Amino acid sequence: MFAVIRTGGKQYRVTPNAVLKVEKLEAEPGSTITFTDVLAVGGEGNLTIGAPVVAGASVTATVIAQDRLDKIVVFKKRRRQNSRRKNGHRQHVTVLRVGDIVAA
């Protein structure tokens, strides 16, 4: 069974026991999060697509850790003008383990 959920402005295809890195969510490690923005649920040859969400469907996940991704370097240079700028940042993410997928 699989589901497509929406969180942080992105869509993720999840299966039970999958480990997933999503945009930072305000939750402590060990806590449980329920996603109700389920866009599609499928498995065993059937697929339910929501318009825009599947009514009554939900996905639960457990927070494993709050982490940061590798550094992204942003470098801008203007040729022949001795002008350059270097910035960087590390994106905050929440690491989740998907639990149950409940279809309507």
Swiss-Prot record:
Task performed by this protein: This protein binds to 23S rRNA in the presence of protein L20.
Taxon lineage: Bacteria, Pseudomonadati, Pseudomonadota, Alphaproteobacteria, Acetobacterales
InterPro entries tied to this protein: bL21-like, bL21-like_sf, Ribosomal_bL21
Protein name: Large ribosomal subunit protein bL21
Keywords from the named record: Ribonucleoprotein, Ribosomal protein, RNA-binding, rRNA-binding
Family: Belongs to the bacterial ribosomal protein bL21 family.
Taxonomic superkingdom: Bacteria
Entry's Gene Ontology BP terms: translation
One GO CC annotation: ribonucleoprotein complex
Cystine pairings recorded for this chain: none
Any one GO MF annotation of this record: rRNA binding
Transmembrane region(s): none
SUBUNIT field: Part of the 50S ribosomal subunit. Contacts protein L20.
Organism field: Granulibacter bethesdensis (strain ATCC BAA-1260 / CGDNIH1)
HAMAP family referenced in this protein's UniProt entry, alphabetically: Ribosomal_bL21
